[in-house]
Amino acid sequence: MQAAQGVKDASGLYEVERRAYHAARPGFRIAELQISPTQKVPWHYHNNVQDTFYVLKGNLRLFLRDPKEEVRLGPGDTYSVKPRRPHLVTNGGDDSATFLVLQGIGEYDFVPLV
């Protein structure tokens, strides 16, 4: 997969119940997101950074490509997605899900898949 031009701030591309940044510095950041049962982080990938998900409350479902995979996470579970691996994040339960996503090391971008 060739590097595609991504956006530096994806907050306007999809809706969440709550978004907060706990750490942000060049090459690394930690965001906390809360999504309702009907919300999702759409299909995308990152050219340079790895996403590491840590579930605080509720359940997440991650769908991945290259290779195709589905991962279910509950409170205390973690999962890392390597750079350039397309993924979609959905709520895997009936209540809101809250999770941390650690992103780095490298320049952040968000490349949406059409």
Residue ranges, per PLM feature:
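Short, charged/polar surface micro-motifs in flexible loops or helix N-caps
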Residues: P26-F28, S36-Q39, N59-R61, K68, ...
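Ligand-binding loop in jelly-roll beta-barrel domains
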Residues: P75, P83-D109
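A short, N-terminal "cap"/entry segment at the start of jelly-roll beta-barrel domains
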Residues: M1-A31, P42-W43, P112-V114
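Short, conserved beta-strand element in jelly-roll/cupin
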Residues: Q34-S36, H46-L62, L102-G104
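A short beta-loop-beta micro-motif enriched in histidine and acidic residues
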Residues: H22-R29, T38-Y54, D66-P67
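Short acidic-glycine-tyrosine-enriched beta hairpin
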Residues: P67-P83
